From Swiss-Prot:
Protein name, UniProt field: Large ribosomal subunit protein uL23
InterPro entries according to UniProt: Nucleotide-bd_a/b_plait_sf (IPR012677), Ribosomal_uL23-like (IPR013025), Ribosomal_uL23/eL15/eS24_sf (IPR012678), Ribosomal_uL23_CS (IPR001014)
Family in the record: Belongs to the universal ribosomal protein uL23 family.
PROSITE patterns: RIBOSOMAL_L23 (PS00050)
Gene this protein is translated from: rplW
Organism: Maricaulis maris (strain MCS10) (Caulobacter maris)
DNA-binding found in the keyword field: no
Function: One of the early assembly proteins it binds 23S rRNA. One of the proteins that surrounds the polypeptide exit tunnel on the outside of the ribosome. Forms the main docking site for trigger factor binding to the ribosome.
Alphabetical list of NCBIfam families matching this protein: PRK05738.1-3, PRK05738.1-5, PRK05738.2-4
Pfam families: Ribosomal_L23
Superkingdom, taxonomy of origin: Bacteria
Record keyword RNA-binding present: yes
Quaternary structure (record): Part of the 50S ribosomal subunit. Contacts protein L29, and trigger factor when it is bound to the ribosome.
Length: 98
């Protein structure tokens, strides 16, 4: 697999919530990433895809909740989020095009 394709597989989607919008004011962007992605891969992918400088990456595993569907208990999938801190003067606007 080429490097560009690997970068697109690393960043699944941006997280657009009230909390992530507040973090964007601090030069931080939140993305959903695969459970197998590590911090180095995430930083490399963000730098390559968005042409910005990354200073730090923090990751969070969000465990899926147990929910009931038609009376049968089921479980939502686990997810992993990455909070990417950008260098001073760099920014990413993930809300354009929505």
């Amino acid at each position: 697999m080429s490097a560009a394709a690997r970068h697109y597989d690393t960043i699944l989607s941006p997280v657009i919530t009230e909390k992530s919008t507040l973090l964007s004011e601090e030069s931080k962007v939140v993305f959903f990433v695969p459970l197998s992605a590590n911090k180095g891969e995430i930083a490399e992918a963000v730098e390559a895809l968005f042409k910005v400088k990354v200073t730090a990456v923090n990751t969070i595993k969000v465990h899926g909740k147990t929910k009931r569907f038609r009376g049968i208990p089921g479980r939502r999938n686990d997810q992993k989020k990455a909070v990417v801190t950008l260098a001073e003067g760099h920014s990413i606007d993930v809300t354009t095009g929505l």
